[in-house]
Amino acid sequence: MNLENKNSFFLNSALFFSTMGSTATTLGFITYIFNTTHSPFNTGAVTIATLLVGMLLGPFLGILVKEKGLMWSMVVPEIVSGFILLIFVFIDNLYLVYIIAFLIGFNNKILGIARLSFIPNITNDLVKFNALLRSINRFALISGSLLFSVIINYSLTMVFVIDAIILFQPTYFID
């Protein structure tokens, strides 16, 4: 497995930052809902909104990724998610959180399918590369939780703004 491959570096970097930001945003949504409603039911509902995408649309999203192409599927959903988060920052609405969580879950599902489909273009050693991706993913989940913990001390809105900025980062990796 050649980790010096430029595409490997870009994919792994994008995965790390995207997952880190998404983790912080998910925790931000949960915190926002609980602080606004003080309802455990509503807090759980925002998590369900992100998971529904995989259940309802997962089987069909692979077709969308194939039709649109891998590069489109790895860049456009991140940028769209960034704009969606910025809209939420300016339009502070409780019910909008559920729609945004669903849309971001939709974009993340497309992105996940595209990333996994792109791996054979980078390496023939799929087992090692998948293990590397899982390790990066877990490290990003921990880093995202830490990022959230630090930023929440200043502002919940800042969590969403920082993730929106992070979501625009795939444009820097386009060749």
Stretch-by-stretch model annotation:
Residues S39-T47, N130:
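Juxtamembrane helix-start elements in MFS-like secondary transporters
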Residues T25, F34, I84-F88, I104, ...:
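MFS-fold secondary transporters
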Residues I79-N93:
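C-terminal ends and interior cores of transmembrane alpha-helices
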Residues T37, G69, I91-D92:
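Helix-breaking motifs and short loop linkers at transmembrane-helix boundaries and internal kinks
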Residues F10-T26, T50-G62, M74-S81, L96-I152, ...:
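Substrate-agnostic recognition of the 12-TM MFS/MFS-like secondary transporter fold
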